[in-house]
Amino acid sequence: MGRFLLVTLSLLVGAFSLNEANSCCCPQDWLPKNGFCYKVFNDHKNWNDAEMFCRKFKPGCHLASIHSNADSADLAEYASDYLKSDGNVWIGLNDPRKQRTWVWSDRSSTNYLAWNQGEPNNSKNIEYCVHLWALTGYLKWNDTPCKALYSFICQCRF
């Protein structure tokens, strides 16, 4: 009986420790994924203001970068659930030098792209920032003027 209680108690302590480890990293109402925390904000901002808003949380926070189909699908589902397909969503991809060289605001590698068909097209030579397109269920990207006002997704490590 004593051994059974000791094993049971050890399992309970371990379970609580694991639960705390999983919930300690992201604030409530942020989505944990691959060591990052993500949050959709429905405040409509231009790309630069959205990036600055994300950076204010703590050093290393930026607009979200996406590096795989799985990440894209998870963030698309999260944005769809939160926004109900109501408007486009800024991500951290942009062309700061206006040379059609796309970079993430967190300086991570540009190893995955999910452009909508015919994009990026730099319509009227003023499209240097990227959003998740609501019309595609947030799965595809579009280049658009950075001054457009959209919701946005921040990415942080807490």
Curated annotation (Swiss-Prot):
| Main location, first listed in the record | secreted
Q: Which species is the source of this protein?
A: Tropidechis carinatus
- Protein name as it appears in the record: C-type lectin mannose-binding isoform
What keywords sit in the KW lines?
Calcium, Disulfide bond, Glycoprotein, Hemagglutinin, Lectin, Metal-binding, Secreted, Signal
Q: Which family does it belong to?
A: Belongs to the true venom lectin family.
Query: How is this protein organized at the quaternary level?
Result: Homodimer; disulfide-linked.
Q: What is the lineage of its organism?
A: Eukaryota, Metazoa, Chordata, Craniata, Vertebrata
Q: What subcellular compartments does it reside in?
A: Secreted
This molecule's function is given as:
Mannose-binding lectin that binds to and agglutinates erythrocytes in a calcium-dependent manner.
**Signal sequence residues:** 1-23
Q: Name one GO molecular function term.
A: carbohydrate binding
- Pfam family of the protein (one): Lectin_C
